[in-house]
Amino acid sequence: VPATAAGTAYYVSADGSDANDGTSPQSAWQTLDMVNAAALQPGDSVSFRRGDVFSGGLMVNRSGTSRLRITLNSYGSGDLPVVTGGLTGTCVRLDGDFIAIDGLQAESCGYAGFSVYGDYGSVRNSAARNNAAGIKVSDGSDFGTYANNTLADNNIMNVNTPGSECGTATAVQCNDDSGAFGFLINGSDNEFSGNTITGSTALSYDFGHDGSAIEIFNGNRNSIHHNVAVDNNVFSELGRGGGGTADGNTYSYNLIRSTCGAGCSQAMGLIARGRTSSFGPTNGTTFEHNTVWLDGPDSQAVVCHASCPASTVVRANILVAVRNSLWMDSAGWTEEQNVLNGPTNIVPSATSTTDPAGFVDAPADLHLSG
């Protein structure tokens, strides 16, 4: 088996054969079974031929190291190689630490396109579509990097049940719907940058519409910056439960726009919560230098409710929405240097303004003209 100081390179193509050794494009494997069975070592790579479609699930349960990651990538020219079908609802599952994905697509997987369970994972330059969750960063999956991915039309509801006796003390299944996630984040200390997330919106019995570009539940200190989110039901919703926390998450320099008609009628930018919510509190949330432009009749750019934590910071954003540009209850939080175009329930700080933002050509071009 040819090897270098960095490890062994393996190849997979639709024209390969599982009788091959997989160590060159000319002797590529054909199926994911060979990759799943391989005893991958730190520094090893598996390259999938562009333009090919691989059915089933891909699972890596070995770990790389900080110096020598295990890498899954692509070779050749054309469209990203696609993994579809999935095993137990996931197309690509990373159980080990220090595993990097660069240039794969996970499509129609049932539940998640990519599920990351280990630490120091990386998913870059990849794509996911037609899943309940494009990329799931699972509980205990920390210190990962997720950059320059395209997550489109991950609009499948994982749970969508009609409730009964809603609004009464005997309510059942009235707020359990979930799904249509671009990213679903249950881990901590991860970085998400340069991603484009579109079309995470779906009909919901409980909420009318549901879905989120970046959902954080029991995840802490994640950094979400320089992403583009278009035509999603919500940009990001924060929540906690079962003894977990969702504290210290930061959002900066993100572009958020929802103008897709009925599917965006209830669109929201950020949802944070206080201690009187069953999913709160979400402490220490910082939302700064973001642009939010929503035109749905019930749209709200930023909402921090249920006794909004005093540790919440909303700073230097442009917030445009029809129902509320900014809604915050309780007191003690920081609101400053914002442009608020749309109703608000607070008295803006002296450093904020309600003057029109002055875009070049909203919503098509949300650069400022000044």
Predicted segments, located by residue:
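Short, T/G/N/S-enriched strand-turn elements that build extracellular solenoid repeat scaffolds
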Residues: D33-A39, F54-G64, V82-V83, G118, ...
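Right-handed parallel beta-helix/beta-spiral solenoid domain characteristic of secreted/periplasmic
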Residues: A14, W29, S45-G56, N61-A112, ...
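Predominantly extracellular beta-rich ligand-binding scaffolds that present long acidic/polar faces
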Residues: G56, N61, S223-A229, G248-S369
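Solenoid scaffold repeats with emphasis on beta-solenoid/beta-helix
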Residues: L58, I70, P81, T90-V92, ...
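Right-handed parallel beta-helix/beta-solenoid
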Residues: V1-D33, R50-D52, Y75-G76, P356-A362
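Feature marks extracellular polysaccharide-active and adherence modules
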Residues: R49, N61, N73-Y75, L94-D95, ...
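Extracellular beta-strand/beta-solenoid scaffold signature
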Residues: M59, T84-V92, S108-S115, N130-S141, ...
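Loop/turn elements at helix/coil->beta-strand transitions in domains of secreted/extracellular proteins
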Residues: A6-A9, Q41-S45, L68, D79, ...
